[in-house]
């Protein structure tokens, strides 16, 4: 959606095919770091996130076994960033504000409930095959960007592997 904002601002036609029918409300990530806030600022996305979140002036690394903590004062970065703090704000809020901004551009459309099930590569274009509301659809485009995560459907169709790994879960996160 952030790429859709960038393309929309430039007037480039863009269609986002999103499998989820609604933005997921569950907490996936909750911290935006200074470089991310600086980047999102260029798209007009930081201000609404700041309004919805909580600024945290420090960053901590804690050894749970001993209770020891290293505390980093992010204010020391004030000469290097416009946002010398972390922002505690649910990722779902970024999805919400980015989708709203993307859809404000006439050249952008977001198709929720669109499940990609095939690709055809041509010399100068690619055709994406997907289902939308139970109906088979196709979309011809000059460029396809797969931004669908580690289990990427798009990556699978172009035979790109994900050589990353998943770390074991070692943290309990409680929100109120």
List the predicted regions and their residue ranges.
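Glycine-rich FAD pyrophosphate-binding loop
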Residues: 5-28
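Residue-level detector of anion-binding/catalytic polar loops
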Residues: 13-15, 46, 108-109, 161
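Flavin (primarily FAD) binding-site architecture
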Residues: 146-160
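Conserved structural-core and active-site-/substrate-pathway-adjacent residues in large, well-folded domains
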Residues: 4, 40, 95-98, 145, ...
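Core beta-strand elements of the Rossmann-like FAD/NAD(P) dinucleotide-binding domain
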Residues: 134-143, 147
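A conserved short coil-to-beta-strand element within the FAD-binding core of flavoproteins
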Residues: 112-126
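Conserved dinucleotide-binding and phosphotransfer motif residues
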Residues: 3, 10, 104-106
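Active-site-adjacent segment of FAD-dependent monooxygenases/related oxidoreductases
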Residues: 28, 33-104, 111, 120
């Amino acid at each position: 959606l952030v790429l859709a904002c960038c393309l929309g601002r430039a007037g480039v036609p863009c269609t986002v095919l999103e499998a989820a029918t609604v933005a997921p409300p569950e907490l996936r990530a909750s911290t935006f770091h200074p470089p991310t806030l600086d980047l999102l600022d260029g798209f007009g996305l930081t201000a609404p996130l700041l309004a919805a979140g909580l600024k945290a002036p420090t960053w901590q690394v804690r050894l749970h076994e001993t209770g020891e903590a290293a505390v980093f004062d992010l204010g020391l970065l004030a000469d290097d960033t416009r946002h010398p703090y972390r922002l505690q704000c649910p990722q779902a809020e970024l999805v919400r504000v980015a989708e709203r901004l993307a859809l404000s551009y006439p050249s952008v459309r977001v198709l929720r409930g669109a499940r990609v099930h095939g690709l055809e590569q041509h010399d100068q274009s690619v055709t994406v095959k997907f289902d939308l509301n139970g109906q088979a659809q196709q979309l011809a485009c000059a460029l396809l960007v797969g931004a669908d995560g580690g289990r990427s459907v798009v990556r699978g169709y172009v035979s790109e592997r994900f050589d990353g790994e998943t770390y074991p879960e070692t943290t309990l996160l409680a929100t109120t």
